[in-house]
Amino acid sequence: MILPRLLFPVLVTAGGILTALVPTFARSAETLSSPVETTAPRDTAAYRREVRKAFAALRADSLSQAQRALEAALGHDPDAAGNDVLRFNIAKILMARRQWHDAEGRLRDLLAHRPDYGEAQIALAQCLSEAGKDSELAQWVDTLLADHRERTTDEVHTLLFLQSEACRRLHQDERALTALHRVLKTDRYNARAHSLIALQLYIEGHRDEALLHLGTALLRHPDDETALAVGAELAEREGDKVTALERLEHLLRLRPDDRPLQVHRATLLLDLGRRNEARRQLDSLRAAAGDELAEQLLPLYHRLR
């Protein structure tokens, strides 16, 4: 099954962290390092210097160096006005390094004294998802969406997709579908929601309804990756490997370096008897990946004999 890998990629990158830090630097130096009433020692010059170091490190993709600089900045001025932004970005760095437990702890600490920090709320949901804490995630999303805080449509959709995936893993299929239908209430042609509904309905045996949802997704958004992935999946389940291959190749044009998709393409080519194309795909994969994919490729090479 090719679908799950496409749905919930890690949403945190160094570039994303860099973008989030820009508002911090856009503030005046006075605002960035202005303290609240405190007796804690301050070194404003060192604070600014470490924040600039963090900014430069992120531009160079050095997450560990950026984290050290941000931690040092917090030590130089513990009560500066911009510190919550720095703490949030430390959590994002930990997420980018896939240190989910540590990131979750930082986000919970931040939310303990800034419970209205919207970006941190969503980042915590992403953390819980990546850590496999599905029950906590589903409840956290319910809590966030019940607080009537003003959120962007994208934020709400992010939370609902995370909840839907968590509920699917918990085998709470109706709850998963409910989350997806909530997406459609604000975006009636959302390709991802229609596609995931289609997959769930098909698995439950509601073939015709599933194909209607898939058709809506592919018609309205022919280049949507989730729609193409589900489309390939359902075509293969229907026994239509030609259509499955067409959709998979369309998806590969959008994700040309996706090796697991390339392996699946080689498998479909072999199933369809297109041995020369399959061999070229396998040889290309072996040349690019070396021994990394040897175990996966060996059975496919055996089929060429």
For the regions a protein language model found, what residue spans apply to each?
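Terminal, low-structured helical/coil segments at or just beyond the last alpha-helical repeat
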Residues: 271, 276-305
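N-terminal leader/linker segments that initiate helical-solenoid repeat arrays
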Residues: 19-89, 96
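Canonical tetratricopeptide repeat
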Residues: 85-89, 123, 158, 162, ...
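Structural signature of tandem alpha-helical TPR/SEL1-like repeats
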Residues: 62-68, 97-106, 132-143, 170-182, ...
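Structural marker of alpha-solenoid helical repeat scaffolds
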Residues: 76-79, 113, 147-151, 186, ...
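Helix-start (N-cap) detector for alpha-helical repeat units in TPR-like alpha-solenoids
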Residues: 47, 81-84, 118-119, 152-157, ...
